[in-house]
From Swiss-Prot:
SUPFAM superfamilies: Actin-like ATPase domain. InterPro entries: ATPase_NBD (IPR043129), D-XK_euk (IPR042024), FGGY_C (IPR018485), FGGY_N (IPR018484). One of its GO terms (biological process) is D-xylose metabolic process. Keywords: ATP-binding, Carbohydrate metabolism, Cytoplasm, Kinase, Nucleotide-binding, Transferase, Xylose metabolism. This is D-xylulose kinase A. GO terms for molecular function: ATP binding; D-xylulokinase activity. ATP binds at residues 364, 469-470, 473.
Amino acid sequence: MQGPLYIGFDLSTQQLKGLVVNSDLKVVYVSKFDFDADSRGFPIKKGVLTNEAEHEVFAPVALWLQALDGVLEGLRKQGMDFSQIKGISGAGQQHGSVYWGENAEKLLKELDASKTLEEQLDGAFSHPFSPNWQDSSTQKECDEFDAALGGQSELAFATGSKAHHRFTGPQIMRFQRKYPDVYKKTSRISLVSSFIASLFLGHIAPMDISDVCGMNLWNIKKGAYDEKLLQLCAGSSGVDDLKRKLGDVPEDGGIHLGPIDRYYVERYGFSPDCTIIPATGDNPATILALPLRASDAMVSLGTSTTFLMSTPSYKPDPATHFFNHPTTAGLYMFMLCYKNGGLARELVRDAVNEKLGEKPSTSWANFDKVTLETPPMGQKADSDPMKLGLFFPRPEIVPNLRSGQWRFDYNPKDGSLQPSNGGWDEPFDEARAIVESQMLSLRLRSRGLTQSPGEGIPAQPRRVYLVGGGSKNKAIAKVAGEILGGSEGVYKLEIGDNACALGAAYKAVWAMERAEGQTFEDLIGKRWHEEEFIEKIADGYQPGVFERYGQAVEGFEKMELEVLRQEGKH
């Protein structure tokens, strides 16, 4: 007899995954449905449809129903005993919204176990599509959101972020303007995460306390929707109507929403006692997969760079994102997203290889060697200026700049900053400089979110975790540790592409097995086998070096402001 099992679902842009763990957090089953490869009847590409004339990107909701049928069938084929499943949670692509019709609750309640979800729920939606995070059709609405409370800083302070095209508030506002009749006939609006939970509950589930922060509507400090922003978003239908559509938001991320709907008991053999737990967003689920403790930092080094941190400090800024932590009251998730990441590093790598006549140009060996041979900030002697640069092959959002390259020399003794005048040995000096540039930006923007780990040691993360392609690179790891610190070191995380589903599954384990008042970090931390997932790859805090980079952060901030001024952005 197997012990209890838990499922975490991950509904992303290109696939739905169901991952099953036991109480010891061991993965026992995985079932995937790839939208492009496995779906029938949808003219999608990479999971979405586009209307380029209006910059719209969206997914057919019926596709997700087909995918859930497919994933559950996949688990059945693997011989999983559904009666062992004790709890279900999920992770959804953030910001996406689902528009339910007036008959949705009735259709959800009356599901016939002999038929698929797709056959029965196709008519449950007032609008057949869900806007995707790649959608950029809402510039007008974003401008109005940014102005509503006085400016971007005020909006960021209230909701954790300035207005973004993909955020649900601006999307709903545009929806009610574009489709006023459909909006009136919409009974409820779900996020992708609460949509997953609704399907299993057999009625509309509330939104999750963390994912609700990706809407530009939730006032994080007040713990309630912001009336002014609701008013702006709702248009002529009014605030009360929009509040009804959105529903209440429970504060406990581990609340038991209710038992699984009898449809799943009859069709698959789930136990009627299987409990549904709020599903959260994909980024909040990622910090649960670690589990990321307060002051830990995670850097995802893919095509773009994402920085995630769990922190007790709430210090919002228009360039960053704050969300409520998905499980732990009093903590926040801090997030930074950059457009320029891997591509910018690869261009320097290729230039270094070309200069050395190395083929193929895609090998990292020379880039690593040059990076490690170059002294911090390119300073061969203490009296040399620090070499600072911005390297943006594509337009950047943090800070908001066109594509381009800028190089400066900074003197920390007198704080002077000069455009570089031929002192760079290109492209060799750029190898270290580009890694430093990316890491200094992370350190600058996460200032004030960490504590001192001990007597006489400056505030810094406890651990720095690296994930994604760049985490395999020893030179990048070494520079990351020198700049970001990490009192326990820099670790490579081997979680593959399962992070979101794992985090959701762990959330279900915690919600069902916690003692009264037991935090997620405590319960999961005791059971997590870190040696299976992580490997220490570099030292973190190094006295002297960390402090020198602290001076470089000041120069880096000056450089950004100077470039913004030159570009007429400041």
